[in-house]
Amino acid sequence: MALKLGVIGTGAIGQDHIRRCSKTLVGSQVVAVTDINLEQAAKVVRELDIGAEVYADGHALIAAPDVEAVLVCSWGPSHEEYVLAAIAAGKPVFCEKPLAVTAEGCRHIVEAEIASGRRLVQVGFMRPYDQGYRALKSVIDSGRIGEPLMLHCAHRNPRVGENYKTDMAITDTLIHELNVLRWLLNDDYVSVQVVFPRKTSKALAHMKDPQIVMLETARGTRIDVEVFVNCQYGYDIQCEVVGESGIAKLPEPSQVQLRSEAKLSNAILMDWKDRFIAAYDVELQDFIDGVNAGTIYGPSAWDGYAAAVAADACVQAQNSGAVVPIALEMRPAFYD
């Protein structure tokens, strides 16, 4: 029997999730939608021909008797409110990042979920579902390259919009690395420093770009992440793990190799959605399957909280230039 989903937020990512849950994935049916712009929500229902009911707001949708699980895809500052409401209603909830806009807000969600007595929250970190990252983690976990000593990573975007500010390199961009690298290493961060190289002429006047974020983990692994959001040439994600006896590198997306006009070339993707489109499908299918089976295994509220704590420290390091400690308490046994 199909899991009946309610989707809060019908912007770009909300529409994508409605489409995949209705047309691509198995075991789910979108029966309810809402958006701050109700006309937009109704338009999405018509265009996708899904027959879902449009609710006045997120709280009405969560309370609807036929909604069995909730997808929160709305504006970031609204996430905490809706996730807490879903937990209070006893309904599983998939929340796009951020889980909340502050670490304190994420902590409220963790506490509410623990009080409920069961896992109800999955956070929309999609990279652990990417085939390349999974293959990289398999090599690390096998011990084939020994213990990880260093990671060299990069997160490059061709360009960003006028509203993008320097701290968003952490909260909107690096946040994915903060989650996936912690997952890759099964290790928590203990400190961070951020430095700014020479500024690119392609960056807007109000922002600093690129940035280099240097992290240290509890076991002493050193990580450097280049964040360059005006690189011009494409959307490019890199991750190289230097171990005691070898090096493992995140594979490039599969592209046709072209021999033409005296050149050997491979195309570089320009859009993050194209780079991780398959991971989005696997991620949401995992949520649907988990809810239908009675157990959610995906990125947890604690993972969302850990990423938020690290992000807060990174922003502090941006502003100070100093090495900033990252203080994360021990993970509750509830999330083991």
From Swiss-Prot:
It catalyses: myo-inositol + NAD(+) = scyllo-inosose + NADH + H(+). Its EC number is 1.1.1.18. The keyword tRNA-binding does not apply. GO terms for molecular function: inositol 2-dehydrogenase (NAD+) activity; nucleotide binding. Gene3D superfamilies: Dihydrodipicolinate Reductase, domain 2, NAD(P)-binding Rossmann-like Domain. The keyword GTP-binding does not apply. Keywords: NAD, Oxidoreductase. GO terms for biological process: inositol catabolic process. PANTHER family: INOSITOL 2-DEHYDROGENASE (PTHR43593:SF1), PTHR43593. Homotetramer. Belongs to the Gfo/Idh/MocA family. Involved in the oxidation of myo-inositol (MI) to 2-keto-myo-inositol (2KMI or 2-inosose). This is Inositol 2-dehydrogenase. It comes from Pseudomonas savastanoi pv. phaseolicola (strain 1448A / Race 6) (Pseudomonas syringae pv. phaseolicola (strain 1448A / Race 6)). The gene is iolG.
